[in-house]
Regions:
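Loop-to-transmembrane helix junctions at the membrane interface
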Residues: 55-88
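Interfacial non-cytosolic loop connecting adjacent transmembrane helices
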Residues: 33-41, 89-111, 125
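C-terminal TM-helix exit segments that contain a strictly Trp-centered aromatic cap at the helix terminus
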Residues: 22-26, 83-95
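Membrane-interface segments at loop-to-transmembrane junctions
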Residues: 1-9, 36-44, 67-80, 104-107, ...
Length: 143
């Protein structure tokens, strides 16, 4: 796993913060979506916020503290939170593109979510495997 640079981590925190503001102000802008974003969007916010907060916390912590084990744990937690967010979004699915005559987009988004959940699940398994190897390799010795 390549070590992330401080600039990349800072950009990640900023991007996640911007997304958090956009998602959490949905009651202000939802009316301009012509019915595409449904009232149920509020029901996915807890999972989206959790994912964004886990990503931001991990990135902020890695700006100052980057031992290999910690980075692996932070990435695995971020992946798990992202997969949870995709699952909740898929189950609730707070979008309806049929309101603008593009009902097929709903199916495409669902397929993309399924692919994302599968990819995230596989990625999480790989990250947990790497974490296990790192835990054994970099185990602390008591002196």
């Amino acid at each position: 796993m390549r070590e992330k640079r401080t600039g990349e981590l800072t950009a990640s925190v900023v991007a996640n913060a911007v997304c958090a503001v956009l998602f959490n102000t949905s009651p202000l802008w939802r009316q301009y979506t012509q019915g595409v974003v449904l009232d149920d969007f509020i029901r996915v916010l807890w999972a989206v916020n959790l994912s964004l907060l886990v990503q931001m916390a991990g990135s902020m912590a890695m700006i100052f503290y980057r031992p290999p084990r910690f980075a692996a744990v932070a990435q695995a937690l971020g992946t798990a939170a992202a997969v949870l967010s995709m699952i909740v979004f898929y189950v609730v699915f707070p979008l309806d593109f049929s309101a603008v005559g593009a009902a097929w987009v709903n199916s495409v988004i669902r397929v993309v979510l399924i692919a994302g959940m599968a990819g995230g699940g596989i990625g999480l398994l790989v990250q947990l495997g790497q974490l296990t190897v790192r835990w054994r390799t970099f185990s602390y010795t008591v002196r």
